Amino acid sequence: MNRATITSNKSNAPSFLSIPLLAHNNNINNNNNNINNNNNNNNINSNNNGTTTTTTTTTITTISYKNNISELITIIDKIIKDLNNFKSKTVLNDQEFSELNNTIQFTKTSLVNYIHYENENKINFNLSDSKIICSEIKIIEYGIESFIFSICKLYQDLIQFQQLLLKLSSPPTTITFNTTINSTNSFTSNLIINNLLKVDSILKQSIDQLLALFPPSSSSLNNENNNNNNNNYNPYELLSNEAKVLWNQFGGNKITFVPWSIFFKGFQKFFNKEILAYESSLRYTLDFTRDGYVTPFKLSVFIKWFGALPVSLGIFQDVINSKIFSGFISGIEATQLLSRQQVGYYLLRCSKTIVGAFAITFVDSTNHIRHCLLYPVTSSINGGLTLQKPPDIFKSILSFILSFSSKLKYPIGPLDNDLLPPLSIINNNPILILPDENNNNQNNNQNNNNNNINTFSTSPSSFFTIDSSNSSDTNKSPTKSRKSSFKNDKDKKEKEKEKGKDKEKEKERVSDENFDNLPTFLNSEDENDNNNNNNNNNNNNNNNNNNNNNNNNNNSSNNNNCNIKETHQTTSNGSSGNNNNNNNNNNNNNNNNNNNNSSSTTKRNNNNNGSDESKDLCTVCMDNEINTVFLECGHLSCCSLCSVKLKKCPICRSRITRVINIFKS
């Protein structure tokens, strides 16, 4: 039985992500031995000559044959057999097995396309020979040499995969802390599986790069005499015009692999900017196959993530500074990290399945963990990101998060030290920088454009309605609205007093609702739960002081509660407040009357005032129907055309910080 000592790992990310890259090692096996330096005594020991010894009866496959791709497929078949064995023994659950097996099967299917290319070009080399990759750090031209380099990288990834499966089959039993063997084995197995998922991600990216650099459909795979790069395809064409200018510094269309040190110098020269503080973050993001090189494929993916090359660096720095990017995390690991988090937590990661896409995993208002894909926009020169349905384009990932910040509130943030901001600003920058308040009109226009954004295809779509009974009087002309809102001086004084209290509370409050640009994702429920919790006392005071005109004052006395509701809402288990029995309007509005912050939602009211919807006209133009609500005052008084022109509410003269489009029921 193998024995190993388990020690705690201070980093959230597995240690193998920060090991020296291939081009900086003296032999291939160093990278494999450092995958789990917390389990250094586990089976495999490396010496200075690069030889490998094991203490188990099962050994890692080594290759010294001419048909290297066929041998890679042999390794893959053994891995597939092991995965099925682990699934049958419930070592891997269904999700973990599916994630790992899909990548391995995809790798096998892809490699089959290159057997003919290898045979026709008589490519003969030993994959286990470390001199192929690590003899020197140099620029690699497009052709046979770059193909061999790519195959060697896949070999390394598969060997890492095999090594972790070996460790998973024989977890250690010697421990250094007081716990049971079963719990220790479970802990160790989970750690190994997480590392497997990391290698799985790198393997998928390596095979994606091979397919991009040497597409199976190109003539380069069918030309018998293609010993050079004289073929109809060149990965140089993956680059935009601006990116080609950058790549020309390294040799133009003849070059495929550029060492990181050379690329980074050219990258700084292109932007005419010293960015040493961001080098580790850039290297983590650009060199996602962990081989120490940058290719046209990697640069093109970077542009898909962060926009056209001239603006990509600025967007990338903003993302790093905002501490929202978690990097290359699998969907399974993201779900695990969010499993005990509250509503509003999210994790921003790079998609493994869609090249150049972002994936956002978040906890929705029903405490379910959901996943969202943001696809790169390739049809636009400036790039951007888009949801699949409908295809609204966001300028950057930050624009998307700010647009839906009522749902994406608390980022998990970097899980690797390389993704942290520079030390000079790491403690000074907020989690997310809000847009300038002076750009109010621009934000309003953005809200109008994003009015019908749908999010996840797995969730039913819905739309917003507003409580018509609460808004019926405030939607009227200024004269009628003021007459109904202030029937006597006592009510007016009480309202001014409530406003004063609200302003004092707003100064002291540090709340995530300050990040909201849009009210919610359009497919979520119970959006106003948090707002109702913060405003319970205000609702109660308002109802007691204004029993005769409850509907008129509902919107105007809450801090940020616009009474925006969805079409399907249910009352939660929190206790409901006192209904105003003095109202003659059959008001069914439930108010919170507890002091322990139990939340409840409010059902939609029916407009029984006898007011006609045709009278709810914009207070500015008096032509269009009211369809916007002002924040922070909560008044509904303008149409969408007039609201973008205003800086102060025409009802209460309060400053307008945001405008939200609504739909009446």
From Swiss-Prot:
CDD domains in the record: RING-HC_CblA-like, SH2
UniProt pathway annotation: Protein modification; protein ubiquitination
Region (Disordered): 30-50, 437-456, 467-609
Region (EF-hand-like): 232-306
Domain notes: The RING-type zinc finger domain mediates binding to an E2 ubiquitin-conjugating enzyme. The N-terminus is composed of the phosphotyrosine binding (PTB) domain, a short linker region and the RING-type zinc finger. The PTB domain, which is also called TKB (tyrosine kinase binding) domain, is composed of three different subdomains: a four-helix bundle (4H), a calcium-binding EF hand and a divergent SH2 domain.
Function in brief: Acts as an E3 ubiquitin-protein ligase, which accepts ubiquitin from specific E2 ubiquitin-conjugating enzymes, and then transfers it to substrates promoting their degradation by the proteasome. Up-regulates STATc tyrosine phosphorylation via an inhibitory effect on ptpC accumulation. Recognizes activated receptor tyrosine kinases, RTKs and terminates signaling.
Protein name per its UniProtKB record: E3 ubiquitin-protein ligase cblA
Organism: Dictyostelium discoideum (Social amoeba)
Classification of source organism: Eukaryota, Amoebozoa, Evosea, Eumycetozoa, Dictyostelia
Gene: cblA-1
